[in-house]
Amino acid sequence: MTSLKIIFAGTPAFAAQHLQALLNSHHQVVAVYTQPDKPAGRGKKLQASPVKQLAEQHNIPVYQPKSLRKVEAQEEMRAIDADVMVVVAYGLILPQTVLAMPRLGCLNVHGSLLPRWRGAAPIQRAIWAGDKQTGITIMQMDEGLDTGDMLYKVYCDIAQDETSTSLYAKLMEIAPPALLHVLDGLDKGKFVSEKQDDIESCYAEKLSKEEAELNWHVSAEQLERHIRAFNPWPVSYFSTRDLQGNTQVIKVYKAAVLPHVDKVAGTILSADKNGIQIATAEGVLNLLQLQPAGKKPMDARDLLNGRAEWFPVGKVL
């Protein structure tokens, strides 16, 4: 079986898992590209990315250019003379000069069934939209944003209680083996690339903290999906005022949908050991696991034990 010389480009833990799979394979990782070290923690000390840490453990040369558009960075990469470049959540734009360097091109592992959910947050957007299925796509990169020709897909069902955390874990199970499968057949021409249909595409924009606020004027089903999509970050939330008039921001980690009632959206219908039930535009959202500021996530009953006055029945949030 042909052993390929690979440049790996990636930054977060998701990418490091793929690098580990390559290191465990018969292929040869000859260089690693990752984002420059960034300040982290209270001390703002420079911290290496998970990919860099793993590469250094295996004595693989690490390159951290701020940009790949400069001639110096491109010539440095050209000298490595790799067969293929594997890109997983790298974070830098690859110009055409770089894309054309390896003889087998640049492969990208993307966390959706392209062309659906191109962009930075495919896992979260798929859950929020109510998709029943997602997966991973391995593609040949071009200069567009996740627009390259597709080589291989693996499908994955989205469970009714799926969170971004659990779906991420599912995709992490299927993605590295799929990457190795493609690499093993790439040099033999086993994979016929398929162009993406732009008409079928949609964009998975990066999540923002502003989007995390719950809007009671949409359906309970949409809100429940919102909560699962925004778990573990940035976490869905709503605000209420305490008896002193202070605003209390409450994060929500888990909720359930109940049948419709004819009440103004945002009205607290009940607050007891079974949850905090809020009327929405369609249906009732039963809040089950919440987190007030400065506390750990807790069941609704535990929050009500200490803060029942925040949730009087009939109050409109």
From Swiss-Prot:
Known EC number: 2.1.2.9
Keywords from the named record: Protein biosynthesis, Transferase
Single GO cellular component term: cytosol
Transmembrane segments: none
Pfam families from the UniProt entry: Formyl_trans_C (PF02911), Formyl_trans_N (PF00551)
Uppermost EC category: transferase
Annotated catalysed reactions: L-methionyl-tRNA(fMet) + (6R)-10-formyltetrahydrofolate = N-formyl-L-methionyl-tRNA(fMet) + (6S)-5,6,7,8-tetrahydrofolate + H(+)
GO MF annotation list: methionyl-tRNA formyltransferase activity
Residues reported to bind (6S)-5,6,7,8-tetrahydrofolate: S112, L113, L114, P115
UniProt function note: Attaches a formyl group to the free amino group of methionyl-tRNA(fMet). The formyl group appears to play a dual role in the initiator identity of N-formylmethionyl-tRNA by promoting its recognition by IF2 and preventing the misappropriation of this tRNA by the elongation apparatus.
NCBIfam families, sorted: fmt
HAMAP family with a match to the protein in the record: Formyl_trans
PANTHER family: METHIONYL-TRNA FORMYLTRANSFERASE (PTHR11138), METHIONYL-TRNA FORMYLTRANSFERASE, MITOCHONDRIAL (PTHR11138:SF5)
Family: Belongs to the Fmt family.
Name of protein: Methionyl-tRNA formyltransferase
Organism: Pasteurella multocida (strain Pm70)
Higher taxonomy: Bacteria, Pseudomonadati, Pseudomonadota, Gammaproteobacteria, Pasteurellales
